A protein has these predicted regions:
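Beta-strand elements within well-structured catalytic alpha/beta cores of enzymes
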Residues: 24-34, 114, 212, 247-258
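Active-site His/acidic residue clusters
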Residues: 132-138, 216-224, 244-271
Length: 271
């Protein structure tokens, strides 16, 4: 009994310390599809062949643990949607699910919690901004393939009377400027700054803002501008820093790590 009470006291005190030291800002970085095979390949890619020891990489220094990633369906390998739903909400679901459970009911995401708490919210991705991973933080849909519906969610859904995402940087003009609806104009009407020119991204001076720099996904880093994600991340943090006394939440995805894997292109993946 004494051991149990001591453990309870320890947990309670730890909870108190954690509550007192909760971070003001949250930066959530995701390498889509980036399993152990990628980090191993990167270790060999970066290694100095003139030494006998395989040198550790930055990923080796920050590794804190691993988790099972199987979805809640009859398959063994997760997809980006089920994986991102688990990461954003803590709920396992079926492959293709966008922040819904196995009954296709919405589950609350950490971005939505942040918005409810008055924080500024942001999504940055090298895919279209309504692709599976970013979508699973700010939308709810039974299928990741419903790209138009997901894009609509970003302006139709309200959290505490406000749009869910204050800053979005990525691709996706194909889904935002359509024959049936022009979401870009709707975002502008809602007070968002807008840019579709990556070279002019710095013209975005404040949030809310929307930057769509490709029709679908951005060019692969191997082919064009290898620092594009770094530049978008830097811009996002510049816009978010100090903007809100309650802090910010931003999800940043290296989307095309996964796309290179699907293509079985090791050079693309390491780029």
């Amino acid at each position: 009994m004494k051991l149990k009470l001591s453990l309870l006291a320890l947990l309670c005190s730890a909870g108190s310390v954690m509550a007192e030291s909760a971070p003001k800002n949250i930066i959530y970085m995701i390498g889509d599809g980036m399993g152990p095979a990628y980090t191993t390949a990167y270790r060999y890619f970066k290694d100095d062949p003139n030494t006998k020891v395989v040198d550790p990489t930055v990923f080796d220094t920050i590794l804190r643990g691993m988790a099972h990633t199987y979805p809640d369906d009859h398959t063994y390998v997760t997809d980006s949607a089920a994986g991102a739903t688990a990461l954003s909400s803590g709920h396992k679901s079926y492959n293709g699910a966008i922040a819904v459970d196995t009954d296709k009911k919405p589950v609350k995401t950490m971005l939505e919690v942040a918005k409810e708490r008055g924080m500024t919210t942001a999504l940055v991705a090298t895919s279209q901004i309504n692709h599976a991973t970013p979508a699973s933080f700010a939308s709810h849909n039974e299928s990741r393939r419903n790209y138009d519906e997901i894009a609509n969610d970003y302006i139709d859904n309200k959290i505490a009377g406000k749009l869910p995402v204050d800053l979005m940087l990525g691709g996706g003009t194909k889904y935002y400027v359509r024959e049936d609806r022009n979401l870009v104009e709707e975002f502008k009407a809602a007070g968002y700054q807008y840019s579709d020119d990556f070279a002019a991204m710095n013209d975005l001076k404040q949030v809310p803002a929307l930057g769509l720099f490709a029709e679908v996904g951005l060019p692969f880093a191997l082919d064009e501008n290898p620092t594009r994600l770094t530049q978008m991340t830097t811009k996002a943090l510049d816009l978010l820093d100090g903007q809100n006394d309650k802090g910010f939440f931003v999800m940043i995805e290296g989307s095309q790590i996964d796309w290179c894997g699907h293509a079985n292109d090791i050079a693309c993946a390491m780029g």
